[in-house]
A protein has these predicted regions:
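Non-catalytic, topology-defining segments of multipass membrane proteins
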Residues: 1-180
Length: 180
């Protein structure tokens, strides 16, 4: 019975504090840094580098952003780029995948992820607008094929590091991009 209580106490300690036993302000700093990296990845990598080809990133930097976006958003580079390019090509028309003019600002702000998912299934959009995006082995066999497993892994990481409060950290990370 001693082993049971030892395991019980270890589980309670982990749920209470995670492996880092971080203070509340350290958890807040982590969440802010992680969400900032996600915003930078969307802005620098997806938007400037991939969608508009306005910036050439070193392959290591590009791959870091691809990996980070897989962990924190589940977004597939080709899909995001194709949808964004179509948005510019069909701006504020009924063909714009996320126009606040035709769909309403509330819809775009509150269900932007659903609009993204729906448009990502339109093969014509992917073919016409998704060119010149990564198409290597890891993109096809991990980042695209298992796009949502990345965010699942991020949940496991957050729970491991911070215990039960890691679920709140993860929820913030998942909500951050659709909100901002």
């Amino acid at each position: 019975m001693n082993g049971f209580w030892l395991a019980h106490d270890a589980l309670v300690a982990w749920l209470s504090h995670g492996v880092l036993a971080a203070s509340w302000w350290q958890i807040v700093i982590f969440a802010l840094v992680a969400t900032h990296i996600t915003i930078a990845a969307v802005t620098i990598y997806l938007h400037r580098s991939q969608a508009h080809r306005a910036l050439e990133l070193h392959p290591v930097v590009s791959h870091f952003f691809r990996f980070w976006l897989w962990l924190t958003t589940g977004m597939v580079t080709k899909e995001w780029v194709a949808i964004h390019r179509k948005h510019h090509a069909k701006c504020e028309t009924v063909d714009d995948p996320h126009s606040p003019v035709t769909r309403g600002i509330k819809t775009v702000l509150l269900t932007g992820a659903e609009l993204y998912r729906a448009e990502s299934k339109v093969q014509e959009t992917m073919v016409k607008y998704g060119h010149n995006t990564p198409d290597d082995w890891i993109e096809r066999n991990l980042y695209t094929r298992y796009s949502w497993q990345g965010v699942g892994l991020m949940l496991v990481i957050d729970l491991f590091l911070f215990g039960a409060i890691g679920a709140a950290v993860w929820a913030l990370q998942m909500a951050w991009i659709p909100i901002t």
